């Protein structure tokens, strides 16, 4: 597909967020989830065991370091129903970001990205809403977390290869994938066509 202004804008937004997070790496600490005496045998190395906590470290450090990162503001107090985890404002423009975590010790599998209905409704209600996913890699051993500075995947759901898991009606994709550049209209139609949700049917 040709590079329309819409597609160029989304790619530019992804580039801005990538630059911000690349700069954030210098501030992201390695840390222990808790004290050794509390969990003397550590945690099982499942991403779900620590993903929310690691996401909080990333979003809170982004806000705490906003001046050094050249940001106007960072908001992360979002309701649980919200598609994005944080709103990053730079030069007066707000970016909507959902932070994901990948365990570098595990395999690259397809992941549930988002419920189709939530994504469809948000993109329908707000034509200016562009969600950006930012996936950070971590090394997780015992109770210690280390960030992998050479791993970062940023993508727009609009450019995902569309596969909807029929069991839960969620888009599934690899964090690392080749983007499929498409218009918002095409994206919405693909969501509608592939969804099993009655709400989305014409």
Segments (PLM) and residue ranges:
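Nucleic-acid endonuclease domains
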Residues: 1-82, 95, 101-202
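Active-site beta-strand-loop-beta-strand hairpin of nuclease catalytic cores
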Residues: 87-98
């Amino acid at each position: 597909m040709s590079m329309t202004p819409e597609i160029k804008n989304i790619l530019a937004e992804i580039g801005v967020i990538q630059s911000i997070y690349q700069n954030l790496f210098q501030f992201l600490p390695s840390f222990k989830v808790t004290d050794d005496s509390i969990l003397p045998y550590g945690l099982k190395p499942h991403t779900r065991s620590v993903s929310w906590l690691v996401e909080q470290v990333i979003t809170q450090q982004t806000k705490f370091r906003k001046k050094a990162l050249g940001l106007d503001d960072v908001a992360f107090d979002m309701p649980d129903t919200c598609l994005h985890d944080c709103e990053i404002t730079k030069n007066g423009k707000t970016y909507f970001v959902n932070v994901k975590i990948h365990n570098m010790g595990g395999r690259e599998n397809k992941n549930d990205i988002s419920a189709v209905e939530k994504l469809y409704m948000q993109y329908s209600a707000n034509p200016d809403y562009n969600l950006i996913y930012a996936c950070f890699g971590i090394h997780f051993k015992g109770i210690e977390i280390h960030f992998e500075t050479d791993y970062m995947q940023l993508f727009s759901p609009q450019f995902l290869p569309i596969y909807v898991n029929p069991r839960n009606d969620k888009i599934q994709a690899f964090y690392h994938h080749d983007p499929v550049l498409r218009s918002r209209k095409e994206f919405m139609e693909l969501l509608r066509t592939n969804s099993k949700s009655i709400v989305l049917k014409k």
